Swiss-Prot record:
GO terms for biological process: cellular response to oxidative stress. Belongs to the peroxiredoxin family. Tpx subfamily. The active site is a conserved redox-active cysteine residue, the peroxidatic cysteine (C(P)), which makes the nucleophilic attack on the peroxide substrate. The peroxide oxidizes the C(P)-SH to cysteine sulfenic acid (C(P)-SOH), which then reacts with another cysteine residue, the resolving cysteine (C(R)), to form a disulfide bridge. The disulfide is subsequently reduced by an appropriate electron donor to complete the catalytic cycle. In this atypical 2-Cys peroxiredoxin, C(R) is present in the same subunit to form an intramolecular disulfide. Residues 19-168 form the Thioredoxin domain. One of its GO terms (cellular component) is cytosol. PROSITE patterns: THIOREDOXIN_2 (PS51352), TPX (PS01265). It comes from Escherichia coli (strain K12). It catalyses: a hydroperoxide + [thioredoxin]-dithiol = an alcohol + [thioredoxin]-disulfide + H2O. This is Thiol peroxidase. Gene3D superfamilies: Glutaredoxin. Its EC number is 1.11.1.24. HAMAP family: Tpx. The active site is at C61. GO terms for molecular function: hydroperoxide reductase activity; thioredoxin peroxidase activity.
Amino acid sequence: MSQTVHFQGNPVTVANSIPQAGSKAQTFTLVAKDLSDVTLGQFAGKRKVLNIFPSIDTGVCAASVRKFNQLATEIDNTVVLCISADLPFAQSRFCGAEGLNNVITLSTFRNAEFLQAYGVAIADGPLKGLAARAVVVIDENDNVIFSQLVDEITTEPDYEAALAVLKA
């Protein structure tokens, strides 16, 4: 099943469906800034915020990383994972230059299956192969408790809705 979002007002197809609240989070393996593999299981017992976006080198994506870095200080027992197709070197450069130490950046560059599993793979248009903008919140037991596939890729996600489910 595919979904439609928009990029600069134009429809874009996204393969599969984003996980819905109440479903079990799919396992994944992504790449950390030191090029090591990181799995969902490594965050067992913690709540996880997956901030998924096309590239850290765009203004809106960078803004979302900055905002979630700030919000990460307000929520206990929670890790914020910022996930994009950027190489770990670019992610590290950005976070280092910005002084962002409260989020963990992860890359899909060796494991594009993540995009399919989480229903964020852009299937057509100029961003084909990248991730659509989305937020998925997962509880300590790896159950999805919130998800948002942002309708317009060039707009920021609903931070307050994601934060509200973590403070509930």
